[in-house]
């Protein structure tokens, strides 16, 4: 029997990697607060019982999850373009996964990404775990924001350090948005003012 997926065999994941939730009885104790995100902030509602106290599900949408550790990286002899890391696409954005992988294996390859400017997208990177070979000034749990048109790439010395490296041991999730992102007060409160200075050569 032949089972055909919507994805081709060279895709970095398959439908088997999509996980659906297991049913659990809803919490019956009330009241329950539900917070809804609105365009200008958050709105809080209070219910007498849990909103998931339902009998079934009808419709085309349902909850599911994809674990970043199930992403199978695409590698090449020379540095691959960002779309090889793409896992999802939606109107106005793409999501990419950077996971442990073999580095470029051409004898003269330079594994570090080249400096570039995203002329039509804002870039957010969430650093989950590992050693981020092209970055300094970040650690596990860091989030970087590079607005559209801002040149960025490896900091001084990171390109040279990458030469001869065999593999990447990192997990990071990137979101590129094709509409400008707006900074909130919360983001301003946790901004690391030293991060832009990490591109200055310390020598």
Q: What function would you assign to each model-found segment?
A:
Residues 15-106:
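A short, N-terminal "cap"/entry segment at the start of jelly-roll beta-barrel domains
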Residues 10-13:
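Non-catalytic accessory regions outside enzyme or core folds
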Residues 1-3:
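Short, small-residue-biased leader/transition segments that mark boundaries at the very start
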Residues 109:
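Short, flexible active-site loops
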Residues 89-101, 112-143, 147-149:
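Glycine- and acidic-residue-biased ligand/ion/polar-headgroup-sensing regions
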Residues 135-203:
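TerminUS-proximal long segments
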Residues 42-44, 122, 168-170:
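Sequence-level motif detector for i,i+2 pairs with an aromatic at +2
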Residues 6:
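Electropositive nucleic-acid-contacting surfaces
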């Amino acid at each position: 029997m032949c089972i055909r997926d919507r994805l081709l065999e060279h895709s970095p994941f398959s439908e088997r990697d999509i996980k659906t939730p297991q049913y659990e009885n809803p919490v019956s104790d009330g009241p329950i607060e539900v917070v809804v995100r609105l365009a200008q902030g958050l709105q809080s509602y209070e219910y007498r019982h849990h909103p998931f106290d339902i009998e079934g599900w009808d419709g085309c949408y349902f909850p599911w999850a994809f674990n970043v550790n199930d992403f199978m990286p695409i590698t090449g002899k020379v540095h691959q373009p960002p779309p090889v890391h793409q896992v999802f696409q939606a109107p106005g954005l793409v999501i990419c996964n950077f996971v442990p992988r073999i580095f470029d294996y051409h004898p003269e390859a330079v594994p570090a990404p080249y400096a570039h400017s995203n002329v039509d997208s804002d870039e957010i990177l969430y650093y989950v775990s590992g050693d981020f070979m092209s970055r300094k000034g970040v650690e596990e749990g860091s989030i970087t924001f590079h607005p559209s048109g801002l040149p960025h790439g490896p900091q001084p010395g990171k390109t040279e350090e990458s030469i001869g490296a065999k593999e990447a041991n990192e997990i990071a999730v990137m979101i590129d948005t094709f509409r400008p992102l707006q900074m909130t007060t919360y983001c301003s409160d946790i901004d690391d003012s030293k991060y832009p200075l990490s591109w200055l050569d310390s020598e």
